[in-house]
Amino acid sequence: MIVITKFLESIVDFLEKNVKRIFSYPGEQILPLYNEIEGSSIKNIMVRDERGAGFMADGYARITNHVGVCLVTAGPGATNLTTPIATSYKDSSAVIAITGRCSRDKIGKNYFQEIDMSFLNFYKGYFVKEPNLKYFEEAFSLSFQNKKPVHLNIPKDVYGEFTIEEEINLNEMKDNNKDNSKDNDNKGNDIVDKTFNWKTLINENEKFKKTLILIGQGIYGTLSYKEMEKISSVLKKLDIPIATTFPARGIINEKEENCVGLIGRRGVIKPLLEADRIINVSSSLSFNTYPESIRKKLLSKTENIHLTPKNIDEIKEFFETFGLGEPWETEKWKRISPQGDYSTKINEIIENIPENSIIITDAGKHTVFTCLLKTCVVPRNIIASHSFGTMGFSVPVSIGAKFGTIDFGIDREVVSISGDGGFLMNVEELQVISEHNLKILMIVMKNNSLAEFCKIKNPNINRLADAFDIDNCYIENVDEIPQTIREYVKKDKPMLVVVETRDEKLPRPNI
């Protein structure tokens, strides 16, 4: 049966069935869609910069394990999305980026804001040249299944045409991911190709005395948030050591007896070297996980399972069927002890916020100290730009994560930790926090410098918070932190805390 409807209405109907909220900034080339969404059941959050829309969609996707959607106009609207979409690509986050375009007859004719838009196709992009929902169906499926950003570029005149819902050959603008699959030693975000058959692994169990399971964030698959929380109860029953990559921390409570914890440059190395077999479950094996100096040695004894479960029963079945060999003892990751003023204050923050808080760090010294000082007990205990290292990440991603907790009934505090450099990169999004009264604790570690690079001069950040009508305070002494956090937890509104710190050198990576 052929169904004919107006394409604009078809898009909004599709979005209403698949998303609860989008993050957007209006502009000429998307006005038809923007206005139609405003009149729909979809919650439309207007950001204050297009970068914010991309980052918020990213944060929403990471905490919910669902798709995050952003909508921006053509030209400068789309170019502003470059950094957040690159971040979601490198960090493997399911983001749909919808951008506007001038009418099809004006493309390539130097029209206002008209440029080639394929720069957003880090993973996949579709030029929606025809009024067909297949573009949307394919984009959402790809993004959700593969946890990557997908770009939908829609010319303005297509909205007014009528949809013919029949099979078409999708017109891909460009797939920039081809060069990312050259060899196993340099795969970037992609899973190593050499994937073993389960039966082969089972038959070989007796050959190995020291099997280590390494789990990456890919194991979240398409699970609901509630099912993500159940993975730890499956893993803690296993007898052999389990290690995690940085983004997968908390997938098993790091207090469990069989949890080795974080491995790699900022984790422990010894279990990787001692194991005679490593079962890699859904990790991309980045250079942070397998450092370059020992990478080839580790890859030679690694067997890969690309498990992308649809429900918790599939994870149970895998580990029950697999059987994993004998238990063995090895070194475990341990949180460091704070040494200087900076790490002592970070530690005091971590010790006083709820243990299951969603801590979202920016890029910088505070990120490393948070990683080294926090014991992760639940999935997404720490969210960071672990593969792209994006400054200006924390505040807008925290906003997206907070909206995700609201939409999906996730009862956890959201805590943003930034340096004074990164905080000022997206400070305009404080208006979104204020406007929606989002309960987010924002910590700014103020040391008036960009790591070891240079000194910087800051504005009065507390007065900035005042301008956005956000409660705030200034802390110099570490003893002030516990009471400040206790007061925040009691309230139902946002708070910004500026923590004056003295500089401190980072511990050296383990390798």
Regions found by a protein language model. Give the residues of each.
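Conserved thiamine diphosphate
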Residues: F112-K148, A275, S282, E326-S337, ...
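Active-site nucleophile and cofactor-binding loops and adjacent substrate-binding regions
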Residues: Y25-G27, I45-F55, C70-P76, D362-A363, ...
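Active-site diphosphate/adenylate-binding microenvironment
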Residues: F7-D13, K17, Y25-E38, P327-T405
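Phosphate/pyrophosphate-binding active-site segments
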Residues: M1-K6, N153, E165-L170, N176-N177, ...
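Thiamine diphosphate
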Residues: I98, K106-S118, L272, I312, ...
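N-terminal alpha/beta PP-like core and its mobile active-site loop of ThDP/TPP-dependent enzymes
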Residues: I2-T321, D411-E413, K439-M442
